[in-house]
Structures are given as structure tokens and as C-alpha cells.
């Protein structure tokens, strides 16, 4: 097992990466890495909120303002030099700051934290 620490001592290399909007990814996996980094590299980055910045007030419905396929944007991915499938990667978050003065969370039929699954039943209309 290989344990890589991305946020290590202060004398480690630092990657500052602020992605352009068109560099955000909307799926997990399959995208080429934005950077190759060495174990111990500290990453200073930014990402968009779960609705791609489209919801800007409490009276906006996410289903009405987000373009299809533009929810949950991702920053990266980063390729860790020397990491192999099966390795354990340790990531230490040193600091987390909100990008805006507001936050958002929501759920709607078939999506969100309060929906039933094949393992968790809820009382509600069938989809």
C-alpha cells in the first residue's frame, strides 16, 4: 500500500490551479488530468457550486435555471505521479473557504438526500 500526502509540509511544491469555466467536468472519471503532480504537492484550487453558479437567489428553482448536464461541476482531475491502481491516497484539507456569501441545498423528485433507494425506503409516491 502506498500512502501519498497531498498537503504536506510547507516546503513542498504548491500547485495553484483556478480552472476556467470551460475546464470544469460534469462527470466522474474519463477526463484527462489537468496536471501531473508529485506526492506531497499542495493544491490551492477553486471549484463551482453544485448548480454551476446558476442559482443566485432563494426564489430561483434549480430545475428552471441550470442547463441540462451542468450540475455538480468538478475541478481536476489530478494525476499523482507514481500512484497505481489499488494504492491508498491520503488527502488532507488544510483550509476550506466558501466562494460566495450564500449556500444552497435542495431536493426534488428522484434526486437528493431524501429519496428512496433499493436499500432505503421512504413514504412517498412512486416515481
What are these language model-derived features?
Residues 12-127:
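N-terminal, charged/glycine-rich beta-strand/loop interface patches
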Residues 2-12:
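Bacterial Sec-dependent signal peptides at the C-terminal "C-region" and cleavage site
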